[in-house]
Amino acid sequence: VTGVQTCALPISVWREVLGAGRVVCVLGAQAANTFTADEALTCPLWRDDPDNPRRGQTCQQQGIDAIAIAPYFGSYLGDPEQAPRVRAMSLDQLFAEISSTAIPESAGWIREYDQLAHDRGLALVSYEGGQHLVGASNDDALTQLFVSANRDPRMGQMYDAYLAQWRGAAPHGTTGLFNHFNYAERYGVFGSWGALEYVEQATSPKYASLTRYAQTPCWWAGCAVG
């Protein structure tokens, strides 16, 4: 059973059961590498296989509607080779780096995928996203820096700028639904992923930014308000 077959069969089943107009079929890819999406959408080995009953067709032609990526910002700051430099940063320096480098890096990925989605007539969505400040090892100093940054009011400002790029860095207008990872989770050595640190927490800089973003009108085709 090929990857294309495991893609095409569920698509056809869901559309038959629920109705084609109610199903959006999404292909996941790596945010930093458009090749992963382009290759999966084309499936050249399957397309050109002489034993393929659908020879000449691409994976995209089996019913793909959208590409999904996880355009996190700041993942490189947790790389082992970056640890000595980042560990020595103050919060001011870390936020300056996020603003000048980390968010623009993510915006560049969005821009490249916006072009790819536009060229292929597809939508672009986010299956995950947000900050990615997590160390590669048990480094207490690095962990404390990243946790403090996630609690700092300036992280809300970073999120405002980041979420604005989800639409602003896509001149072709392909971007749509953005999913943040995640809702509530304790911060620590394995990351500070939650918009909140626990379910009962009233708010946080990240949560407030995400709430503001969620209240803005949606702009993509087929979206519903209310």
Locate the predicted segments by residue.
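Short helix-capping segments at alpha-helix termini
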Residues: 14-20, 59-60
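Aromatic- and acid-rich polysaccharide-binding/catalytic face
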Residues: 1, 50-101, 120, 131, ...
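Structural recognition of the beta-strand scaffold that forms the well-ordered cores
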Residues: 24-27, 65-69, 123-127, 176-180
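Catalytic-core region of carbohydrate-active enzymes that cleave or remodel glycosidic bonds
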Residues: 55-56, 100-129, 139-174
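Aromatic-rich peripheral "rim/lid" segments of glycoside hydrolase catalytic domains that contact
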Residues: 137-165, 174-226
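Short, small-residue-biased leader/transition segments that mark boundaries at the very start
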Residues: 2-3, 7-9
